[in-house]
Regions:
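Small, basic N-terminal interaction modules of short regulatory proteins
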Residues: 1-79
Length: 79
């Protein structure tokens, strides 16, 4: 899995798999699109207004927690 983020547009994309086939984009809401293959496999999720969608804190940081290891990492989302 890979997460990309473009702070200029506040857009993130969560890659669940690399695209190996043509996908169909389904608009789930005004702020979320999901890319799905013909067999129903989800390839990725596009998040518009990513700071809010990803639950960034008031300083624009996304905190990723590895529950198994009890470790966390911070990613700066805001400019």
């Amino acid at each position: 899995m890979k997460l990309t983020y473009d702070p200029r547009y506040n857009v993130a994309y969560i890659y669940l798999k690399e695209k190996t086939t043509q996908v169909k984009t389904i608009q789930v809401s005004d702020q979320m699109n999901v890319d799905i293959a013909p067999d129903g496999t989800i390839y990725g999720i596009e998040l518009l207004n990513a700071n809010q969608q990803l639950g960034a804190d008031s300083q624009g940081k996304l905190i990723v927690v590895n529950e198994a290891l009890g470790e966390s990492s911070e990613i700066q989302l805001a400019l």
